[in-house]
């Protein structure tokens, strides 16, 4: 079953914990710390593949990459978690399901985007040795991997989009001009999902057609099937309005343009042609009168018959010329990935009480594993290196004042 909208959850792997371990071997009475590092958690990527034609292949609703292994003694590092690559159709747009931000537009074969970054592995206790800290009994825990909900929207990539009423002969026209085999039947709403076909102009030149389910009056208010599929013509360079010559084509064109404009006014400015289909059902004079009346609407009109093939060579040439002279439409650009902002902010919350907001420092605090008291010296080094000490002094924090940061609370003792 064709599916062009899907919400999934992606979760990257957690980083492995660093080990608290000491060398214990015969004849080595004072072995030092030898805790290995944890492995990095696997990340989650989306990759565009032309061989994938629908989001329905994504059978799961949650996708999780592998966690990193924990470090071990004897300086043994944990193995990194395996990355997870999810293949999606070309033309898939990726949104953050909670914020609505566009994260990626995967239009090229093999184009890959990182959607959930794996957590960093924690460092083992052998990294925290210093002249005053010979046997650290603490290490770093691994970071949690990113987790987010994604909304995937497939927008077909084609040069020409076919727009018309149900049973106007769009699928027949697609089949007559290309090697596509859409379902064709003498009743409305035969086409329930978009179809693609390639029109071969010569051995070197070709262009693609996209046929979407028929649009009816009131589609912009939720009637019928066509409106929800109009996104599939948003990328097309040219629109081809397919009209049934025997069924009020002037009124039909007016309705189609009204509904298309209600979906996206920019589509009305897209270069367009009119294919007056099923002319084999009318007399030549009637066809000419209809074509002249439609031409007064400001669009080039080509009488055709998908059944007999009449007018199709001229339609191919006209579409090809328009495609060649029209650049691809501008699409919304993805939002650049936001990195954690560095910096330190000291905020007074009460008399003699201050809160420190420093994302990078809070990351260090959250990852301490083991003896916190023994880690105090290391944390003081982190505070100095990250500018917390300087920020507290600049804010006028005095000895004995209460400082809160990352869930910890302590009395401030200025460095001498």
Curated annotation (Swiss-Prot):
One function term, GO molecular function aspect: GTP binding
- Kindly list the places in or outside the cell where this protein is found, as annotated in its UniProt entry: Cytoplasm
Q: Where is the composition biased (Basic and acidic residues)?
A: 63-72
Gene3D superfamilies tied to this protein: GTP-binding protein OBG, C-terminal domain (3.30.300.350), GTP1/OBG domain (2.70.210.12), P-loop containing nucleotide triphosphate hydrolases (3.40.50.300)
Its needed co-factors are:
Mg(2+)
Where Mg(2+) binds, per the record, is at 171, 191
Read off the Pfam families from this record: DUF1967, GTP1_OBG, MMR_HSR1
Q: Does the keyword Manganese apply?
A: no
Keyword Nucleotide-binding among record annotations = yes
Q: Which GO terms describe its biological process?
A: ribosome biogenesis
Q: Domain OBG-type G, which positions?
A: 158-324
- Family as reported in the entry's similarity comment: Belongs to the TRAFAC class OBG-HflX-like GTPase superfamily. OBG GTPase family.
The entry's function note states: An essential GTPase which binds GTP, GDP and possibly (p)ppGpp with moderate affinity, with high nucleotide exchange rates and a fairly low GTP hydrolysis rate. Plays a role in control of the cell cycle, stress response, ribosome biogenesis and in those bacteria that undergo differentiation, in morphogenesis control.
Protein name, as recorded: GTPase Obg
> Which species is this record about?
Thermus thermophilus (strain ATCC 27634 / DSM 579 / HB8)
* Encoding gene, per UniProt annotation: obg
């Amino acid at each position: 079953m064709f599916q062009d909208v899907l919400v999934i959850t992606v979760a990257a792997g957690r980083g492995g914990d660093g080990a608290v371990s000491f060398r214990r071997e015969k004849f080595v009475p004072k072995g030092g710390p030898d805790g290995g590092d944890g492995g990095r958690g696997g990340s989650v990527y989306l990759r565009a593949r032309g061989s994938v034609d629908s989001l329905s292949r994504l059978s799961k609703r949650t996708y999780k990459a592998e966690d990193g292994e924990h470090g071990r003694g004897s300086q043994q590092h944990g193995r990194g978690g395996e990355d997870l690559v999810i293949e999606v159709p070309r033309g898939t747009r990726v949104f953050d399901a909670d914020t609505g931000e566009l994260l990626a537009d995967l239009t090229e074969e093999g184009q890959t985007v990182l959607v959930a970054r794996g957590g960093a592995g924690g460092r083992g206790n052998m990294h925290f040795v210093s002249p005053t800290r010979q046997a650290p009994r603490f290490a770093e825990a691994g970071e949690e991997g990113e987790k987010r909900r994604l909304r995937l929207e497939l927008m077909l990539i084609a040069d020409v989009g076919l727009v018309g009423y149900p049973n106007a002969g769009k699928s027949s026209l697609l089949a007559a001009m290309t090697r596509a085999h859409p379902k064709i039947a003498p009743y409305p709403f035969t086409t329930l999902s978009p179809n693609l076909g390639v029109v071969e102009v010569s051995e070197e030149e070709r262009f693609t057609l996209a046929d979407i389910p028929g649009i009816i009056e009131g589609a912009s208010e939720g009637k019928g099937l066509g409106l929800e599929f109009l996104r599939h013509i948003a990328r097309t360079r040219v629109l081809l309005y397919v009209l049934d010559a025997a069924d009020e084509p002037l009124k039909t064109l007016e309705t189609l343009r009204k509904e298309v404009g209600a979906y996206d006014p920019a589509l009305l400015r897209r270069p367009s042609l009119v294919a007056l289909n099923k002319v084999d059902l009318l007399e030549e004079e009637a066809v000419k009168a209809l074509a002249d009346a439609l031409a007064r609407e400001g669009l080039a009109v080509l009488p055709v018959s998908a059944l007999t093939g009449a007018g199709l060579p001229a339609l191919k040439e006209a579409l090809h010329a328009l495609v060649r002279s029209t650049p691809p439409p501008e699409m919304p650009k993805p939002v650049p990935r936001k990195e954690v902002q560095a910096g330190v902010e000291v905020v007074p919350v009460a008399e003699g009480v201050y809160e420190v907001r420093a994302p990078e420092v809070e990351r260090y605090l959250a990852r301490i594993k083991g003896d916190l008291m023994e880690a105090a010296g290391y944390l003081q080094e982190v505070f100095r290196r990250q500018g917390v000490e300087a920020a507290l002094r600049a804010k006028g924090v005095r000895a004995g004042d209460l400082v809160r940061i990352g869930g910890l609370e302590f009395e401030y003792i200025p460095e001498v």
